[in-house]
Every structure is written in C-alpha cells, then in structure tokens.
C-alpha cells in the first residue's frame, strides 16, 4: 500500500488539532474580582480599619488628619486583596479612583501630604516621629522588607524630594520616589485621582485633576508588583503633619481588581469572589 505525502500532512494536521483541543481542555480559567465603591463615609464604616488619628465625620468625609501639628492617620480596606497568585504567577489588573481635599489655614505652609498605598496585611503606621514619611515608609533608602508601593501627593519639600516643591510621586519600598511630577495645590478644593495598574506591562499610572480646571497631572512608571509586595495585601490611605500642617480628607473611593487565573484541570482549585462595600 502506498502512503502519499498529502495523506501524511492531512494526518499531521488532524493530530495537531486534537492535541491543541486536549491541551485547552486541561486548562481552566477563573477570575477573582474585588470591587467596592464608597460615595459617603459613615461614622460606622465597618469595611475600614482606622489607624492613628483617622476618623469619619458626620459630613461623610474620611478625615486622615486634622489641621494640627504632628498627626498621622491611616485607613485601610478591611478585606485583604489577592494582588498576585503564587501558584500561577498571574498578577491582578486594578484601578482605583478617589477624591481628596487638602485644606490648610495658611496656604504657604502646608504639610505633609497623603498617599494611597499597597502594603502587607499586617501593615502599621511607620516613622510616627517624622511626618515627611507620610506614615507609610521608614527610610529614604530602598528597603526590600517594607514590601510597599505608594502613590504620594506631597505638599512639603524634604531633603530626599526632587527640586520641584509639591509633587506627585510613585514610591517603591522607600519615601524617595522613583518617578515624580510637579502639581499645584488648590487649597481646600476637591481633586480626583485615578490610579491604574496594567499587569501585562507592569505599568502603574496616575492622573490627578481638579474638576473645572483645565490641567491634569500625569505620571507613570514600571512597577513589577509581584517582585515587591506579598501575594495578599491591604490597600488604603495615609497622611501626616509635622511642624506645618493641613487637614487631609478623602471624600470618595472606588476600587476594582481582576486577577485572571489559569489552572491545570487535573489540579484546579478554582475560586471566584466579589467583595463590595
């Protein structure tokens, strides 16, 4: 019996198709979701952990600090966030939108600023005696053990800061930012901040804008979260004052993350969760 080359390629094509189908059958996709929106902070806000001087007010604000000297306040979302998966190596995409206001009695002397941060689940306020660290970091030099990423909105110039005065910064494991851009504080006015992380490119991007004003302040950098923070983290805000001061408020906060997981079907342990405020 003869066996033509055309028959060989037909059989090879069929075999490859069957292999691809079987390979895909053995893969299971799952997505873990975390999503919440807080449009008004209640005085009995059960999904937040308060540290230091942070409180919620009768007017619906999350007040991190009052306009007093030497104050630190932090508020964390109570449920840990699965930011990357150790079994698959997959990392979550996320975005968070928040509205803040910084109000100082004297607009020329404002300190020190606030930060959105991602940190270990057991995170505690850092460097309480030095307000320039914003209650998030304990050093101006890189310290891998901190396992923290932050977006700082800095109102006071310290020795480790860039030459520009007030700035937005992306910080990794220390208070000295890896990227910065200047911004103009509108005393007492609400500003919106959008923070996004793209797991495919490892790009963390920040956009700050004041409603009704034309300028936007934009910043981005590569931040490989899987190499920096633990698999499970907490997210939240921190603010601090020193000899100079201001009231630091959060007026609105939403967060959404998606962790797409691909498992082997033979050993799949698939879960999907949605958390809401």
UniProtKB/Swiss-Prot annotation:
It comes from the Eukaryota. Keywords: Calcium, Glycoprotein, Lectin, Manganese, Mannose-binding, Metal-binding, Signal. It holds the Pfam family Lectin_legB. Glycans are attached at residues 143, 269. Mn(2+) binds at residues 152, 154, 161, 167. CDD domains: lectin_legume_LecRK_Arcelin_ConA (cd06899). The keyword Kinase does not apply. GO terms for biological process: response to symbiotic fungus. Gene3D superfamilies: 2.60.120.200. Residues 1-30 form the signal peptide. The keyword Cell membrane does not apply. GO terms for molecular function: D-mannose binding; metal ion binding. Ca(2+) binds at residues 154, 158, 161. InterPro entries: ConA-like_dom_sf, L-lectin, Lectin_LegA_CS, Lectin_legB_Mn/Ca_BS, Legume_lectin_dom, Leguminous_Lectin. Binds one manganese (or another transition metal) ion and one calcium ion. The metal ions are essential for the saccharide-binding and cell-agglutinating activities. Lectin that may be involved in a cell recognition process. Belongs to the leguminous lectin family. This is Lectin 1. It comes from Medicago truncatula (Barrel medic).
